[in-house]
Amino acid sequence: MRNIALFLTYEGTGYHGWQMQKNLATVQQTLEKAIAMVVAHPVHVTGCGRTDAGVHAKCYVANFRTTSTIPSERLPYALNTHLPADIVVTKAFDVHENFNAIGSCARKEYTYIIYNSRLKDPFYVNRAWFYPKYLDEKIMQEAAQQFVGTHDFAAVRSVGTDVKSTVRTVYYYDVERQGDLIYLRVCANGFLYNMARAMAGTVVYAAEGKIRPEQISEILDSGNRTAAGPTVPPGGLYMTHLWYDDGIAKFQCPE
């Protein structure tokens, strides 16, 4: 039985997230259906994370097992003929039998995009969060820096989600403006449910003057979700980089 890893990219507007849901279109469901048509047997696809409804992926890693002998380099072309235009497989390769797209992942980067202009741009609908009031990226960077390090991130996750631990390590959180677009890039060893979007909302809170950047440390210590900023809309969020280095596999997506 072969274990095959896939690199894919998708525009998530038309999907109810990654994970399979009954009677709803999801990326996992769509991908599994396409793979089954190519390899001629049902498959279960493991993804590197559960992106929410409307969230996009510039690069996403998944893996599945198959008895098919089709060469891995031919798989992207075969799969893409059965996939809709908003999901594209860019690479396929054989991996160790113990490789797991989520369990083997060491770090992930998400990028949140804000369209910061007084006028909307129709080409960024569902691709960036339109925010008409001017945001000072220097204040945003000062706020973002407060998240870097190992902390309990319970204050920036969805209330009611059940996990063993809410402690995570954030390696960097960078804010960059390019014209009317503001990019918030955050890398961590893992993300809680809605954590990246709640962090972005808290950074915007600081730029709005609703909290001081240095208060973010206190908010994290409190674990109080209501003290942090809002969970910003999903359309501005992209999975943008993944790192694998667990002794089983060592690669990055994108390469």
For each feature predicted by the language model, list its residue ranges.
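Structured-RNA-binding interfaces characteristic of tRNA pseudouridine synthases
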Residues: M1-E255
